[in-house]
Amino acid sequence: ALKKMTRANFVAGIGGTNTPCFFASSSSDQVINNNSTTKLTFSNEVYDVGGVYNPSNYRFTPGFSGKSYISVNLWTEDGQSSIFRVDLWLYKNGNPTVTTQQRYTSSNTTVERQAAALNVTMEHDNNDYFEMYGLLRTVDSGSATMLVGSGNNALFDNYFTAFKIIE
């Protein structure tokens, strides 16, 4: 039998929560050496509903089987203005799964600051885990830095976040 369309009946048919969820940012500068795949450290938990992010090993373990939306941003700086490539990798259970790359067509074109972002929906089991890795290339083979501001400059330029997708 059909029910009368009321707000209560309508709302009862939809719902769920987008938790667990977390948002972590960098709490200190991190040096990334040239052409070296580096685990990105997001040790400042802004929030962690469900205790799914570990700020010691920088892992997201969802704790449920389903799908999560995962997002990361990497903002880097090289004082010598020699960055020509920035790669981001999402690792699942220790293996690279998704990548995004910001590259110039030639190492003759370089920048002082470069950002890369990765946004993806991932299917997982309750005990799968996710980590973020980055790689930078500079023309002078020097390192670059994942920067963290302070005071009025303390923006969330570098972050790792995820939330549950309601199905």
Language-model-detected regions and their locations in the chain:
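Extracellular jelly-roll beta-sandwich "head" domains, especially the C-terminal globular C1q domain
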Residues: 15-167
